Amino acid sequence: MWSGRKLGSSGGWFLRVLGPGGCNTKAARPLISSAVYVKNQLSGTLQIKPGVFNEYRTIWFKSYRTIFSCLNRIKSFRYPWARLYSTSQTTVDSGEVKTFLALAHKWWDEQGVYAPLHSMNDLRVPFIRDNLLKTIPNHQPGKPLLGMKILDVGCGGGLLTEPLGRLGASVIGIDPVDENIKTAQCHKSFDPVLDKRIEYRVCSLEEIVEETAETFDAVVASEVVEHVIDLETFLQCCCQVLKPGGSLFITTINKTQLSYALGIVFSEQIASIVPKGTHTWEKFVSPETLESILESNGLSVQTVVGMLYNPFSGYWHWSENTSLNYAAYAVKSRVQEHPASAEFVLKGETEELQANACTNPAVHEKLKK
């Protein structure tokens, strides 16, 4: 491994670097400065002169132990910036997380890779606002969503979270990418009003399901479901954190040949509208599949409408065609009162007849029969 040469200054630096990790470099230094290596010309193996062996025998043993200890530490070493991703985050794809981690500092560049999302706010913010206003009997002008509690799942840098907060809502934005949340927190700090209305957390949806069950008036998952690895679990969690009668808003990409051609081949590989690897066609979901899963979890789909993006103008507009992007709005069913059992109803009718029997002879005769 060492080609019969002395472990010189570079080797000493290597051991010194490993020193803070707990390796005993003091035991290795005598070997570096005094041990003599002789290369066997026939076998190419390493040998030590007999006179030197006795003198440095103890040093050799200590040094080998030191080196092996250091190598074991190297095997288990993890750079401090290499984030560990919990396996309990069942819907979070670690590959997707790494993709967005590399772009975390670009969220608020309106001319950068997230320009389409900035432009999408022209559609999705009114879409959310107008549908929520249908559930609010009286709203305050200028702050129409005042009093509403909204969860923005996969909030990224807060591009949609902030407009919802400006409409008066109390918004919690969650994202599994720590750098995304740092960017979002930094940006909202420039607006004291938003700083009070918006809260950001580094977590997945599954991690807050129990503590936030039936807490939110609305859940928003915009451009998120095409990145999760377990769609059914994700949507089930969305339903669980909604109040009865709460609203769920989703924008995503349909799973069609057209979406593959334009959403991946053109947008990523040709025009570079979004970075390569941002989307995986297999994760795209059709409106029919989405509606089926939502209805199985007690949500009723109210609206599905297509969205089209013009890469030349940079604007979005609504469309009847849902072959590419689309928005969906669903409402969680309200808790229904359980109907009284037949036994309970019969018992009530009997007690009523007995009470009337005291004053009505006809009823008394009826009970005898």
UniProtKB/Swiss-Prot annotation:
It catalyses: 3,4-dihydroxy-5-(all-trans-decaprenyl)benzoate + S-adenosyl-L-methionine = 4-hydroxy-3-methoxy-5-(all-trans-decaprenyl)benzoate + S-adenosyl-L-homocysteine + H(+); a 3-demethylubiquinone + S-adenosyl-L-methionine = a ubiquinone + S-adenosyl-L-homocysteine; 3-demethylubiquinol-10 + S-adenosyl-L-methionine = ubiquinol-10 + S-adenosyl-L-homocysteine + H(+). It is found in: Mitochondrion inner membrane. S-adenosyl-L-methionine binds at residues 124, 154, 175, 222. Pfam families: Methyltransf_23 (PF13489). Its main location: mitochondrion. It is a peripheral membrane protein. GO terms for biological process: glycerol metabolic process; methylation; ubiquinone biosynthetic process. Component of a multi-subunit COQ enzyme complex, composed of at least COQ3, COQ4, COQ5, COQ6, COQ7 and COQ9. This is Ubiquinone biosynthesis O-methyltransferase, mitochondrial. It comes from Homo sapiens (Human). The gene is COQ3.
